[in-house]
Structures are given as C-alpha cells and as structure tokens.
C-alpha cells in the first residue's frame, strides 16, 4: 500500500521534475536568475562547400550587439560578409546602438581554406532586465575549400568589421566628408594660397582672354577638376592601403604613432617649421605644368592635376592629416569623396577670382596667418580622437578640454588689443566658454571627476586577479567584504555607480565593509580565471564574504538593483 501511494505521488509530481521546474523549485534566493550564456545565445554553425552559416538562437528578453560581432579567419580567406539589419536600441550610457533579438543568421563565404583552417567568432550580448555577459569566443573549424578562378577573395587577414559596419563607423570619425569642403575653403584663405589665386587665374586664361563668362567658367572648373582628380586618386589609394592594414591600424602603438604625426603636422601650421615637397620635385612638376597649353580645357585640366601634387607649406600639413585620417578609417568611398570635396573647396574661391577678378579677394594681412593657425587646432583634434581609444573616456575628456581651452585662449589673445565694442562682446563670450571648457581639468586637478565620483565614491580597492583576492582575504580578519565586478561595456554597472553606490544610505550601510572591485573590461585570461573561480556568468555581479573569506549564502547580487532594493538587501546580511 505504501509503495503504491509513493508511486502515485511521484507520478503526480513528475511535471515538476523537468529541468526548468526543478531549478525553480530548488533554487535559492541568492542564485543567478539569468540564463548561462550558452543558453541565452545558442550558437551553431554549418558549412556546405564554400558557404558557412553562423546561427544564433536568442532567448526572449536577451539580445546580441551588432558592433560586438567579430570574425577572424585563421589560415583561410573569406569573401564579403553582410550582416542583417538589426534593431535600434537606445541606451542611457552608450547612446544609440544596434542589437539583434530572437535570431541572428550570418552567411560567411569561404573562398579558400584547408583542413587546418578555422574562424574565430566573438560576440557579446545582454539581458534586457539589466545583465551583460563578457565577450564570448567560439572556434569554428572549416572544411577544405579550393579557390575558384572567378572568386573574388578580399582578405586573408583577420576580419574585424563587415563592409557595412565599416561604413557605419564613418559616423564615429571626427568629421564627415562634407566637412572637407569647408576645410578646403578655409585653406584657400591661408597666406600661402590666397595671394597665388590672381596669378593662377591669369595662367588659366592664357594670353588671349576668353570673351564669355561661360568659357571662363569652364576653364576655371577644368583646372579645379584636374586638381580634384589628383586628390581623389590619392584618397582612394590611401584608403585602400588602410583597409588592408585595418586591424594593425587599430593597435594602440599605431594609434599613438599616428597621433604623434598629427601633432607634428599641426605644429607646422603654427610656424615652428615648414613642410613641403623637395625643391627638385617641385621644380620638375612646375616645368611639366608650364609645358601645358593654357587657355584650353585639356591643358588647364592637366595643369590642375599637376598643381594638386605641388604642396605649399600651408597645404602640406592639412593634406597629410586628411590622408592619415582616411588611411586610419579604411573607407575607400569616404576617402575619395573627402579628398574630392577638399579640392573643390580650395577651388571655389579660385573660380570666383577667375570669373570676376581679384577685386573680390580680401586684402592680405595678418588674418591669413590666423586662419592657418586655426587649422593647426583642427588638426590637433585628430590625435585627441585617436588617443581616446587608448587612454579611455576620462582622459579623452581632459584632452578635449585642454584643446578647447587652448583654442579659446588663442582667440582671446588675438582680440585683446581691439577696442571695438563687438569684439569686446566676443571676448566675453570666449572667456565664458573657457570657464566652461576648463571644468574637466578642474575636476581632474582637484580629484573630483565624474568617473572618480561614481567609481570611487565607496573607496573601492581594485583587484586584477584571483591571487590578489586570495591575499586580501587572508589578510582580512574582521570585516565583511563586498566584491563588485565592473566593466566599461556593462550598462547596468554604470547604473549601479550612478544611482545606487552614490546613495548616502547605501554608503552608510557599507561604512564598515571592505570594498573590492574587479574591472574585467579587457576580458583578459586572468580576469576570465577570476570569473570562473567565483562562478560569475555576467555583470553586474556583487559578492559578499564574511571575515573568514567564505561567501555569505544567498547574498549574491545579479543584475541591477536601485538604491532602495540594494539597501534592503544589505540590511538582511549578517552583521
């Protein structure tokens, strides 16, 4: 009778014994409610001949980041990879991003592979409730693929960006190609360029001046287009070269080297030294230009094309800076378009002078040198943009602040002798802007930056690996320990800093607690080991240990908690 009753009881309870139900039934309150990364993003792949399909099945309430998807071939060559369109996702800290829900399928054409070939796939995602996983890496073995004669193989190097994502990254570069036309117009008013325009216009027209404005316009436009074609070809060549070395150009040492070059180019704009082609090369180019027939469309076009290669001291630095910028972007379309618009901007004043005479030109004076120096500050913005990727956002803000203060101070000094009323108003505006721009520098000097306030308001002690944690635990004899896992890519971690750790009640509750923080942004082997040792699946995760170094049961925090909930959680911890 007892045996039958027991069997009936087990039969009735069997629906509860599925894995999910069993976990829910026996799960402790402090356990992680979020799925393991392999269950949240179920990854699979299949290769049929030269076509490889990568498939992610994404659980409801979870999403993958478009920008965090990277594909690296190893001993293989891949064709063009096209990512599907994602869904726009607004984030308080990272702004507008593109994510994938439910499913992501990526088709990877394999143009060449052997039996030892692989591709390394890296991806990262989050839970919508406020929980992010570290970057995941999967090794996908490839079957041998013999390259076809008609196959257009584009890369045997690591592919970190798809063509679409590379073009999207153009939005994050310091300026769009349309800004190049304004830069070109500005360069036209520097002391090395503007005084030459009347002479160039007379050379374009030749000894027999055309009678109609239409003829004059087409001659001037031919000269400008010749110059623009030369610059466009330079842009395409440099961008194509940059695309081949795109991964190397993202290396911190390369970014630092490019930044130094930009700074040297900018210093030449301030008159410290002059940059130009060797005189022998310039002489040869000038002789070739003089051999062209002026007054004819083809001859004028050829003169413009050669003039594009003859760089004056005022144009060498900006042109070199733009070329380096294009090489770093690796975007061939934007590269050619940027240089074309730059040349067109330089040519617009020349067209006006050729049509209507040099009376349209403003008088020469010191202001032309000021224009040249202003472009020096513009070039200095490029190394700041590049160095941000190496030194981080906090130092990046300080560099932008320093550059802004320098530029505004330069403008104030230039106008300080003027007695004009409007100039006085401009000086007042410049002073106000300088005070605003100095704020990040003031915060840094006094040690009160926003980042420091948010990250160190609780006086966290930073740890980097498992050995450091063990050593601290051994030395700790009487305090409760809180270990916070943080990463720059973790949105909810930043929410903890901004909304929870800054709360006075939370700070009071943790007053007698030893506060540790592990920054796992880089996902290094040591950081991975620390995560694995403590069974941390994702971030944010906060652990509490007693004075003996043992984790307090049911105390682990997974995901974001506001100040009220976190304060209640702290109150339930054993004292």
Curated annotation (Swiss-Prot):
Any one GO molecular-function label of the UniProt entry: electron transfer activity
UniProt keyword Transport present: yes
GO biological process: cell redox homeostasis; cytochrome complex assembly
Stretch forming the signal peptide: 1-24
SS bonds (residue pairs): 126-132, 192-314, 490-493
SUPFAM superfamilies for the chain: Thiol:disulfide interchange protein DsbD, N-terminal domain (DsbD-alpha), Thioredoxin-like
Cellular component, GO annotation: plasma membrane
Coiled-coil spans in chain: none
Family according to the record: Belongs to the thioredoxin family. DsbD subfamily.
Protein name: Thiol:disulfide interchange protein DsbD
Organism of this sequence: Photorhabdus laumondii subsp. laumondii (strain DSM 15139 / CIP 105565 / TT01) (Photorhabdus luminescens subsp. laumondii)
């Amino acid at each position: 009778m007892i045996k039958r009753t027991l069997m009936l009881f087990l039969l009735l309870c069997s629906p509860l014994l599925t894995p999910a139900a069993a976990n829910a039934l026996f799960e402790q309150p402090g356990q992680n409610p979020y799925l393991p990364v392999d269950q949240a993003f179920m990854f699979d792949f299949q290769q049929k001949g030269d076509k490889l399909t990568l498939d992610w099945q994404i659980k409801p309430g979870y999403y993958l980041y478009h920008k965090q998807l990277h594909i690296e071939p190893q001993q293989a060559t891949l064709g063009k990879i096209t990512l599907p369109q994602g869904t726009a996702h607004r984030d308080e800290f990272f702004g507008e991003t593109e994510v994938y829900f439910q499913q992501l399928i990526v088709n990877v054409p394999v143009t060449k592979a052997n039996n030892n070939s692989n591709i390394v796939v890296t991806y990262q995602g989050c839970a919508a409730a406020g929980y992010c996983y570290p970057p995941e890496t999967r090794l996908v073995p490839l079957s041998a693929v013999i390259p076809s004669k008609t196959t257009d193989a584009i890369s045997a190097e690591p592919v970190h960006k798809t063509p679409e994502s590379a073009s999207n990254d153009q939005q994050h570069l310091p300026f769009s190609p349309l800004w190049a036309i304004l830069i070109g117009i500005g360069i036209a008013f520097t002391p090395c360029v503007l005084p030459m325009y009347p002479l160039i216009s007379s050379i374009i027209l030749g000894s027999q001046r055309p009678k109609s404005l239409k003829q004059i316009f087409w001659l001037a436009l031919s000269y400008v287009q010749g110059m623009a074609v030369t610059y466009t070809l330079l842009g395409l060549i440099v961008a194509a070269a940059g695309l081949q070395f795109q991964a190397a150009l993202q290396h911190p040492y390369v970014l630092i080297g490019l930044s130094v070059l930009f700074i040297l180019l900018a210093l030449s704009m301030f008159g410290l030294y002059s940059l130009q082609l060797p005189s022998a090369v310039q002489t040869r180019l000038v002789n070739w230009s003089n051999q062209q027939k002026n007054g004819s469309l083809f001859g004028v076009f050829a003169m413009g094309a050669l003039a594009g290669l003859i760089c004056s001291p005022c144009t060498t630095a900006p042109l070199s800076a733009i070329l380096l910028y294009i090489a770093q972007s690796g975007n061939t379309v934007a590269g050619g378009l940027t240089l074309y618009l730059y040349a067109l901007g330089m040519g617009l004043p020349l067209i006006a002078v050729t049509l209507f005479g040099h009376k349209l030109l403003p008088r020469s004076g010191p202001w032309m040198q000021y224009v040249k120096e202003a472009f020096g500050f513009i070039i200095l913005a490029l190394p700041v943009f590049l160095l941000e990727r190496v030194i981080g956002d906090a130092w990046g803000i300080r560099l932008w602040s320093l550059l802004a203060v320098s530029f505004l101070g330069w403008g104030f000094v230039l106008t300080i002798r003027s007695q004009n009323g409007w100039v006085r108003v401009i000086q007042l505006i410049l002073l106000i802007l300088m005070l605003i721009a100095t704020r990040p520098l003031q915060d840094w000097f006094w040690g009160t930056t926003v980042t420091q306030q948010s990250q160190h308001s609780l006086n966290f002690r930073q740890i980097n690996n498992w050995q450091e944690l063990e050593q601290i635990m051994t030395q700790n004899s009487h305090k409760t320990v809180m270990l916070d896992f943080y990463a720059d890519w973790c949105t909810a971690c930043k929410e903890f800093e901004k909304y929870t750790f800054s709360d006075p009640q939370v700070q009071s509750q943790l007053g007698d607690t030893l506060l540790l923080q592990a920054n796992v942004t880089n996902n290094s082997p040591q950081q991975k080991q620390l995560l694995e040792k403590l069974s941390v699946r994702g971030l944010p995760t906060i652990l509490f240990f007693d004075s003996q170094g043992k984790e307090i049961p049911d105390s682990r925090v997974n995901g974001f908690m506001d100040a009220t909930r976190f304060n209640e959680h702290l109150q339930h911890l054993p004292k």
